[in-house]
Swiss-Prot record:
<dbReference type="GO" id="GO:0046872">
    <property type="term" value="F:metal ion binding"/>
</dbReference>
<feature type="binding site">
    <location>
        <position position="62"/>
    </location>
    <ligand>
        <name>a divalent metal cation</name>
    </ligand>
</feature>
<feature type="binding site">
    <location>
        <position position="106"/>
    </location>
    <ligand>
        <name>a divalent metal cation</name>
    </ligand>
</feature>
<keyword id="KW-0560">Oxidoreductase</keyword>
<keyword id="KW-0479">Metal-binding</keyword>
<protein>
    <recommendedName>
        <fullName>Putative quercetin 2,3-dioxygenase PA3240</fullName>
        <ecNumber>1.13.11.24</ecNumber>
    </recommendedName>
</protein>
<comment type="similarity">
    <text>Belongs to the pirin family.</text>
</comment>
<dbReference type="GO" id="GO:0008127">
    <property type="term" value="F:quercetin 2,3-dioxygenase activity"/>
</dbReference>
<dbReference type="InterPro" id="IPR011051">
    <property type="entry name" value="RmlC_Cupin_sf"/>
</dbReference>
<dbReference type="InterPro" id="IPR008778">
    <property type="entry name" value="Pirin_C_dom"/>
</dbReference>
<dbReference type="Pfam" id="PF02678">
    <property type="entry name" value="Pirin"/>
</dbReference>
<dbReference type="InterPro" id="IPR014710">
    <property type="entry name" value="RmlC-like_jellyroll"/>
</dbReference>
<keyword id="KW-0223">Dioxygenase</keyword>
<feature type="binding site">
    <location>
        <position position="60"/>
    </location>
    <ligand>
        <name>a divalent metal cation</name>
    </ligand>
</feature>
<comment type="function">
    <text>Putative quercetin 2,3-dioxygenase.</text>
</comment>
<dbReference type="Pfam" id="PF05726">
    <property type="entry name" value="Pirin_C"/>
</dbReference>
<dbReference type="InterPro" id="IPR003829">
    <property type="entry name" value="Pirin_N_dom"/>
</dbReference>
Length: 285
């Protein structure tokens, strides 16, 4: 008998403002971050109004985790203290490992038009929180994409995609949390059953349309809702009218999570050290 992953929780994000006043939806991020371990935060930006994004994210620090920015529409410029410069374009990805520390800015390269995309924060294990920082800019043409026999369009940002018929290695593979990150576009009547490792935390965020998680107790996920699933079993998705959904899966770290603004460590003492290091100019070296 097939065992399916159960929907444990449905979650709705809330309006938020970050950077110099950028308006966004904070899908996850806040109290009880252990529920989403190893994922710390997911922000969605989706606006046609330049006033919502034009101020951008001026220079600011990070320590202790990774950020993944995935752009659907619009253009965003990254610059950091290491001398990295990158222009995020539609379909592109930026994977930044803050680790010991990075100081960077993310500023829009446009004053009109749509700005749509996501930023995901992925935790690092304690042993790697003070490793050297890193940055990778992945051009749209270097992000693997495929279409299944059933007409589902798949963007494989991280990890390995396998639905039993098609396989594809993503743009990024990370050993710490073994993240899988897909953007799926299901047509009307579309179905897909991506294979994900048992033991991985699985999150689904539907950002267009709606879909159903199949199983003994099918659950429909509406637009702009996130589902947290059980860590074992098969995943089967279908959409009657069509949908776009982010699939996030990662190996939980099961370590203490202490966050203060842009710093994510394992203890209050480590947060205080990060604040001192930033004040003394040695956070990002």
């Amino acid at each position: 008998m097939t065992r399916y992953r159960d929907v444990l929780e449905l979650h709705t994000g809330h309006p938020a403002s970050d950077g110099a006043g950028v308006r966004l939806t904070r899908v996850i991020g806040g109290p009880s971050p252990e529920r989403f371990d190893p994922f710390l935060m997911l922000d969605q930006f989706d606006t046609q109004n330049p006033d919502d994004y034009v101020a951008g994210f001026p220079s600011h620090p990070h320590r202790g985790f990774e950020t993944v920015t995935y752009m659907l529409e619009g253009r965003m410029r990254h610059e950091d203290h290491l001398g990295n410069r990158g222009l995020l374009k539609p379909g592109g990805v930026q994977w930044m490992t803050a680790a010991h520390g990075i100081i960077h800015s993310e500023m829009p390269e446009q004053v009109e038009g749509a700005m749509r995309g996501f930023q995901l924060w992925v935790n690092l294990p304690a042993k790697n929180k003070l490793a050297p920082a890193g940055y990778r800019d992945i051009e749209p043409e270097d992000v693997p994409r495929l279409e299944t026999a059933g007409g589902v369009k798949v963007t494989v940002i991280a990890g390995r995609f396998d639905d039993g018929q098609a396989q594809q290695i993503g743009a990024v593979e990370r050993p710490d949390t073994e993240p899988h990150y897909y953007d799926l576009q299901l047509p009307a009547g579309g179905r897909i059953a991506p294979r994900l490792p048992d033991g991985h935390r699985v999150l689904l965020y539907v950002y267009e349309g709606s879909l159903t998680v199949e199983g003994e107790r099918p659950v429909e996920i509406a637009t702009n809702r996130l589902a947290r699933l059980s860590e074992e079993g098969e995943l089967s998705l279908r959409s009657e009218a069509g949908a776009r959904v982010l699939v996030l899966a990662g190996k939980p770290l099961h370590e203490p999570i202490v966050q203060y603004g842009p710093f994510v460590m394992n203890s209050r003492e480590e947060i205080e050290q990060a604040l001192r290091d930033y004040r003394d100019g040695v956070l990002a070296v």
